[in-house]
Regions:
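Active-site capping/gating regions of soluble enzymes
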Residues: 1-110, 118-124
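Acidic, glycine-enriched catalytic cores built around paired aspartates
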Residues: 112-168
Length: 168
């Protein structure tokens, strides 16, 4: 049985898993140093950044990381064009299945403009501020290490750290 946003209980559990793993998944979703410049961009003159900075969800509201525009589906708005599509999909599926298996509750949707009301929600988890922080979250996450295999995660982190060193 769904609710006013039109998702089933299982879909909410899936959503809960994705929200729970967002910080480590950010290493896949936003795999470059410049990715975090987009996430942490200051608001434009219009008052929007068009990029989420908090781990939150809502209805048809683009100011949140996840929006539910229509019954039966949700849109994950975090990743950028540099993401590896295979790691992205595998990460979302792994996190979502973890949410289903553990019956994770995503909490209530936040039905406000997060660009103007973010300060009203100081307890919301924030997205990582830089790639190094996202990689640390990934390295600390046992669920994704189990889903991908520890050697895959370690190799990915090593590669990204080499890219960071080359960039600097």
């Amino acid at each position: 049985k769904g609710n006013k946003l039109g998702l089933s209980k299982i879909a909410y559990n899936f959503l809960g898993g994705v929200l729970n793993c967002t910080q480590p998944l950010s290493a896949f979703f936003n795999p470059t140093i410049n990715s975090y410049r987009r996430i942490n961009a200051p608001p434009t003159k219009s008052g929007a950044t068009w990029s989420p900075s908090t781990i939150s969800y809502s209805g048809n509201n683009r100011t949140h990381m996840i929006r539910i525009p229509d019954p039966g589906r949700f849109e994950l708005r975090l990743m950028d064009g540099a993401t590896n599509p295979y790691l992205l999909q595998a990460g979302v599926i792994a996190a979502g299945l973890e949410g289903i298996n553990k019956r994770m509750d995503p909490g209530e949707p936040i039905m406000v403009n997060m660009y103007t009301h973010e300060k009203d929600y100081p307890n919301l988890n924030k997205l990582p501020n830089e790639l190094e922080e996202a990689l640390q979250y990934l390295d600390d996450n046992k669920e994704l290490k189990e889903a991908f295999g520890e050697s895959v995660i370690k190799s990915y982190i090593k590669l990204k750290n080499q890219e960071i060193t080359s960039f600097n």
